[in-house]
């Protein structure tokens, strides 16, 4: 029976180009979609750019463009990747669209009416210079456990400790270097801990769709059981902060000025927005298609790093907003190279665009990924030697080789006409059975099993062909009797029928090649469907070259670091070149003295300056203005020693006279990490000592 499916992949964040992980996920989903369509099912396969959030806003600001312009730039390059790897979405959209605004706000209002939205006052770090609340990734400081410097606000990359941002020692804003302050703000929470949500998720995470397929893979189900409380019955779900404060690039929360939906609320809603846009363009009824009681199956392909959002928040949001919940969540692992995490610095990064630009066949990669992917949450390893061996041995040596040998005999001696001696019904039934097994493997996402079975069939076809030795019969074909000619024609016809069946089985993986085989070799006027495997061909056109072998040297080019990266000049120290050389006499003219900071206070009317009162051992105090307000709180500097340019001519400023200059280190770009550092001598130095 024909089914209707709504299929999505995770939305790529629109502040960068596609990486190889995106391409792997899209290929995995594309293979599944193509196989389902070949079975006669209706599939709506949509994607979109995840176009909101602080990272996009800040990157656009840094480049001096609007967030919309940044998103549009990356959206414009998507087709080059998708078309290049034969990934065929029905529609590509964006979360920064009227459809997504309307749907996100509708879902929010529905959840609010269900009593599942709660307002709470929370304290967060706030950057007083940037004028915005800081997410954990924008806060850095000293790890409270191992004391490693410059660690993020939620975890330490050195010791692995997890902590709250408020536990960091000497925290600073990664955006400006300023010391953040704690500030209260009202936020909106989705009450995932509500007993209704917990009960629903306990049922949904262990449930199955209409086809009897579990919503979640076993590994994912086990993980959600941990989050839901496991077998002890104790609910462990926390509520979800779904709001962010202005300035923020996103969707405004209804009736809450200055508040925006957190990007992870409106991003998955983008699946629905893309489908709604597609339905409008195609004249389809969006609401009927996603009727919770309707037959449409909702299927998501995602990576293992975003399970929490998709297996808990997303289905609960949809359920209590009165919408259709997902039927299947297909989770995959990451890509490694030769068993290790990809690394540009080690020359093991794979750029999808570079892959295409150096002339590598997209279907080599599609085949290799299919040969490695399965339905479990496992990482897929790309091994260069294995890649070359599989493509050259399987696709060229086994699969294409059948057609190149058999078609030559048929076109040369039988004018392209195929004829079979014996029971063709049995042969057709054999191909039908094989194709059904492969189709089922693809539907179950056991792609590696499907590929193994296909190549086993190819081996048997080649073995039968070699055992019959048609080249021996062909040598004397001019003088051969009718039986010998019929035998030669039958051997080659059966091989080509097998090749056609293999092409049908490989069509989800190698769509471009299979289409060529169908149209150019066998004269079809449409791409293959699963039922074509059992339709024995009657004619074959002269063989044309179908696939090139992989040149191992291409792999060297693929992993070669980009020329710009290899030849880039060494980074300038501190972001600027060293100053011109001076003599010791020039340096001696500068009188550097140790000074104690007796007092420090903010300067009213200035966003950059602090007023320092310094003891330089002169029997009087000096007044010095310093542009270090973004990095220090006044009280933190009192009592500290520092270094003063003592013989600098006094400078009359708007706020008073500055009698010298305190030395501080910073990057040439004052907004760059890690900010400004006032020089502080070792303990034991005394005010008035000269620095020589």
Swiss-Prot record:
Keywords: Aminoacyl-tRNA synthetase, ATP-binding, Cytoplasm, Ligase, Metal-binding, Nucleotide-binding, Protein biosynthesis, RNA-binding, tRNA-binding, Zinc. Zn(2+) binds at residues 143, 146, 156, 159. GO terms for molecular function: ATP binding; metal ion binding; methionine-tRNA ligase activity; tRNA binding. ATP binds at residue 344. Its main location: cytoplasm. A motif ('HIGH' region) lies at residues 12-22. InterPro entries: aa-tRNA-synth_I_CS, Anticodon_Met, Met-tRNA-synth_bsu_C, Met-tRNA_ligase_1, Met-tRNA_synth, Methionyl/Leucyl_tRNA_Synth, MetRS_core, MetRS_Zn. It catalyses: tRNA(Met) + L-methionine + ATP = L-methionyl-tRNA(Met) + AMP + diphosphate. The keyword Zinc-finger does not apply. GO terms for biological process: methionyl-tRNA aminoacylation. It is found in: Cytoplasm. Its EC number is 6.1.1.10. The keyword Cell division does not apply. Belongs to the class-I aminoacyl-tRNA synthetase family. MetG type 1 subfamily. Homodimer. Is required not only for elongation of protein synthesis but also for the initiation of all mRNA translation through initiator tRNA(fMet) aminoacylation. This is Methionine--tRNA ligase. It comes from Bordetella parapertussis (strain 12822 / ATCC BAA-587 / NCTC 13253).
